[in-house]
Amino acid sequence: MNKVSVIIPSYNRFEELLNAITSIKKQTYKNIEIILVNDKSSQKEYYNYDWAKENIKIIHLNKNTRSIFGYPCAGYVRNLGIKIADGKYIAFCDDDDIWFPKKIELQLEAMKKTGCKMSSTDGLIGIGIYNSKKSYQKFNAECNLETIKNKFKKIGSKIMNNGFPNILDYKFLKIHNCIICSSVLVEKEILNKINYMKNLRNGLEDYNCWLRCLKFTNNIYLKDLCFYYNGQNYAK
């Protein structure tokens, strides 16, 4: 059973972070390590919490990325986690998102069947901490579907006529980024080939990374709802 290393960048969202970690620990696939990278949060809980007891690797930055780059740089933070990861696979989970229990299991099965070295999924989008009693939109199948269809229509493509394809390649993703970071599972070998994420502004670093990954592998896309995305700052 191959190990999956989960990278969580975090800044001043301790309550949300604990929810994210709990959801990862509830995965049906159990060979998982969690690597938390603290972007010099000011909340004291980050420094008082017993991470070792929870079997979580922790990196505390000496300087916040805002002071290093002039803007929050999740790519830089994630790269620190990737570099110390032991897993064959790397997964990402933002500190205010959560996973549903079969996420990793389903993705690994799909990657094995197709030979793809990268996978993403659909999920739910909402505002604030996930509440299982609330109703949420599907991120791609509902929230983004018409926007993406229109983009493909403008270039004369019929690929989206029947919804999302199972395989997302470079040409497809170049039209529109429909991959949420917290849904991604990718072989570390691919990230090594592209020299990890670039130090771009948040919201740009992940899309840039996916495009570069797709020069070495296709992405198997699952329509299963495998995550909840806190879209507090999301804009179509």
Region locations from a protein language model:
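The conserved acidic donor/metal-binding loop of glycosyltransferases
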Residues: 94-98, 122
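Conserved nucleotide-sugar donor-binding catalytic segment
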Residues: 75, 148-236
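Acidic donor-binding segment of Leloir-type glycosyltransferases
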Residues: 21-66
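Glycine-rich, basic loop-to-helix element that forms the pyrophosphate-binding segment
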Residues: 63-85, 106
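Conserved donor NDP-sugar-binding/catalytic core segment of glycosyltransferases
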Residues: 102-152
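N-proximal low-complexity "stem/linker" segments adjacent to membrane-targeting elements
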Residues: 1-25
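Short aromatic/hydrophobic "clamp" motif used to bind/position activated sugar donors
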Residues: 90
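Short glycine/serine/threonine-enriched helix-capping/active-site loop
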Residues: 9, 61, 116-126, 222, ...
